[in-house]
A protein has these predicted regions:
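Sec-dependent N-terminal signal peptides of Gram-positive bacterial secreted proteins and lipoproteins
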Residues: 4-26, 416-430
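Domain-terminus/edge residues, biased toward the C-terminal soluble/receptor-binding domains
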Residues: 157-161, 171-174, 178-417, 425-437
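Cytoplasmic C-terminal tails of single-pass
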Residues: 435-457
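Membrane-entry signal-anchor segments at the cytosolic-membrane interface
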Residues: 2-6, 409-411
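A broadly tuned, weak detector of single residues within folded domains
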Residues: 8, 39, 61, 114, ...
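Active-site-adjacent loops and short helices of periplasmic peptidoglycan-processing enzymes
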Residues: 21-178, 182-191, 196
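Structural signal for terminal/edge beta-strands and the immediately following C-terminal loop/tail
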Residues: 410, 422, 451-455
């Protein structure tokens, strides 16, 4: 009876073992974004934690205004205008804007400061402010849009083309999640940009065309519940919303939790009515929150490699003191890893510049690259450098140089020609010598047989 109990307990333990291992292995959860395209990036290092169709062209809607604002802040840095400059709206700046588009209800002849216009642009996405500031900076909206495209190219945006400064739909107005990240990253370098983008509200004082102040409330539900409840994300900081029927619902946001800072891009999300038939869910916000939680909860920063650690021995030629040099990482490497991946689980892939290096080698010489990956996902890349000096042997170097000299095609051809000439010369000399000896023998024989004329008596 006792034995049966022991056997039963043992079998039960064996059955439970897979459950324990499953708990450990499944600590990391995969993520699937419910939108056309998206991106989650660690802001400080640029590490990509998640991407979906990141290089696929999409319509950006009012996310365009991040580039518009960037050019304004760069013009301020260049001294071409200031936040306190007064700008008057023109008829041309207001022409062609959609009547149902986002607006701060600015009218022709109305004067505001650059700072007030930027708040209208980034907090309530007012379309007219983009044209007003574009005209003020570049002389015309068309010239400003041309500058937007030039700046996109300068930032490395390979799949972006702007047709206007507002983001209103145009089939030739497109970008990608990755390109928008590049633009946003640059704009975030301006503290005032982030200050405005993270503002829940703003009051525009009375102007020359209004008697009362205007209250602006952010269109970003992650930082303000004034327009809709249930979306506020406590770690969110900005940045910009956008939507058109063609673009869907779009959002670029950042979030800070502790010492960690992330940037997200969501393009082409939907607005849906839930099963209760009443609640409307705007997925650009809910998916952004879900993606932030996934990134913060399932990635851990770990030290994976020290620059002092040897990585590989690289063969060295032309040295009499050693036949290898030690390669090491150019820098200490730490990276965000899924919470079920330990540093020792990373696969190391070494790509050498040359399979064998010739001495002399100096410490710090580039030998190749090291890639750290797991399940086909690359988590870090770095250069491999020589750890120490390796001197060259003059004898081995000279022998190599001589060998290389005679290995050259032209030298080979000349060598064959010279050899043939030598052979021809030897043959000629030999034949000439033989002929000479043969002729000498004939003359000698003829001379020895001559008796002269017989005398007659």
């Amino acid at each position: 009876m006792k034995k049966r109990r022991l056997v039963s307990l043992f079998l039960s333990f064996l059955l439970l073992l897979p459950l324990f291992s499953l708990t450990s292995a499944d600590a990391y959860e995969s993520f699937d974004l419910d939108a056309r395209a998206g991106l989650l990036i660690e802001a400080d290092t640029g590490e990509i934690l998640y991407e979906k169709n990141a290089h696929q062209e999409n319509y950006p809607a009012s996310l365009t205004k991040i580039m518009t604002a960037l050019l304004v802040f760069e013009a301020i840095d260049e001294g071409r205008l200031s936040l306190n400059d007064s700008v008057t709206a023109t008829e041309s700046a207001l022409n062609g804007l959609a009547s149902d588009g986002s607006t701060a209800n600015i009218v022709a002849g109305e004067t505001m400061t650059v700072e007030q216009l930027l708040n209208c642009m980034l907090i309530v996405s007012a379309n007219e402010t983009c044209n007003i500031l574009g005209e003020y900076i570049s002389g015309s909206v068309e010239a400003f849009v041309a500058r937007m495209n030039d700046r996109a190219t300068e930032l490395g945006c390979e799949h972006t083309h702007f047709a206007n400064a507002t983001g209103l739909h145009n089939s030739q107005h497109y970008t990608t999640a990755w390109d928008l990240y590049l633009i946003t990253r640059e704009a975030m370098k301006h503290d005032k940009f982030m200050e405005i983008c993270n503002s829940k509200s703003y009051t525009v004082p009375a102007t020359n065309m209004t008697e009362k102040p205007r209250e602006l409330h952010s269109t970003n539900f992650l930082i303000s519940n004034w327009r809709a409840r249930g979306y506020v994300y406590r770690d969110a900081q900005g940045i910009k919303t956008g939507s058109t029927p063609e673009a869907g619902y779009c959002l670029i946001s950042s979030a800070v939790r502790g010492s960690r800072h992330m940037i997200s891009v969501v393009l082409g999300a939907e607005r849906v009515t839930l099963e209760d038939g009443v609640t409307i869910l705007t997925r650009s916000f809910s998916e952004t929150s879900r993606m932030f939680d996934w990134g913060f909860d399932h990635f851990v920063r770990r030290d994976v490699l020290s620059s002092a650690d040897p990585v590989q021995e690289v063969p060295v030629a032309l040295s009499s003191e050693t036949n290898y040099v030690v390669a090491h990482a150019a820098e200490d490497i730490s990276c965000l890893l899924p919470d079920n991946v330990e540093p020792e689980m990373l696969e190391r892939t070494v790509t050498l510049t040359n399979e064998t290096v010739d001495a002399p080698v100096a410490a710090g010489d580039l030998l190749g690259t090291l890639t750290l990956s797991y399940n086909d996902t690359v988590y870090a890349e770095t250069q491999l450098l020589a750890l120490n000096d390796v001197s060259a042997s003059w004898f081995l170097t000279a022998r190599r140089d001589v060998s290389d000299f005679f290995a050259k095609p032209l030298v080979k051809i000349l060598s064959v020609v010279v050899l043939l000439l030598i052979v021809a010369l030897v043959v000629y000399v030999t034949m000439f010598s033989r002929r000479r000896r043969y002729g000498h023998r004939r003359r000698s024989r003829a001379g020895s047989g001559y008796r002269g004329r017989r005398r007659r008596f």
